[in-house]
């Protein structure tokens, strides 16, 4: 992941896309930790950034699960159903 995503940007994704982004972020964190352990990591701050991205993704998924903040992809599907009726 080249750039950090904000929670507002993440809310625009579907649950499937969020789980895919979560998987990618976890893989990146694993690789960064491995590089840090072997002394090959150049940018230590990237570890912190990736951890925060993972936390943001979990937060958005939990908001959706609790119904606090629906995902944008879901809102557009609901509006389409209402318009069809």
Curated annotation (Swiss-Prot):
InterPro entries noted in UniProt: Ribosomal_protein_uL29 (IPR050063), Ribosomal_uL29 (IPR001854), Ribosomal_uL29_CS (IPR018254), Ribosomal_uL29_sf (IPR036049)
CDD domains: Ribosomal_L29_HIP
Domain of life of the organism encoding this protein: Bacteria
GO terms under biological process: translation
Sorted UniProt keywords: Ribonucleoprotein, Ribosomal protein
Protein family according to the UniProt entry: Belongs to the universal ribosomal protein uL29 family.
A single Gene Ontology CC term: cytosolic large ribosomal subunit
Identification of the protein by name: Large ribosomal subunit protein uL29
GO molecular function per UniProt: structural constituent of ribosome
Keyword set includes Ribosomal protein: yes
Listed PANTHER family: 60S RIBOSOMAL PROTEIN L35/50S RIBOSOMAL PROTEIN L29, LARGE RIBOSOMAL SUBUNIT PROTEIN UL29C
The encoding gene: rpmC
Native source organism of the sequence: Thermobifida fusca (strain YX)
Keyword Endoplasmic reticulum among record annotations: no
SUPFAM superfamilies noted in UniProt: Ribosomal protein L29 (L29p) (SSF46561)
């Amino acid at each position: 992941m080249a750039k950090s995503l904000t929670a507002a940007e993440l809310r625009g994704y579907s649950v499937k896309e969020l789980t895919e982004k979560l998987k990618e972020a976890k893989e990146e964190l694993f690789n960064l930790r491995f590089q840090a352990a072997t002394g090959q990591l150049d940018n230590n701050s990237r570890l912190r950034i990736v951890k925060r991205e993972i936390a943001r993704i979990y937060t958005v998924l939990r908001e959706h699960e609790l119904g606090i903040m629906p995902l944008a992809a879901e809102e557009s599907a609901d509006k389409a159903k209402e318009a069809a009726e």
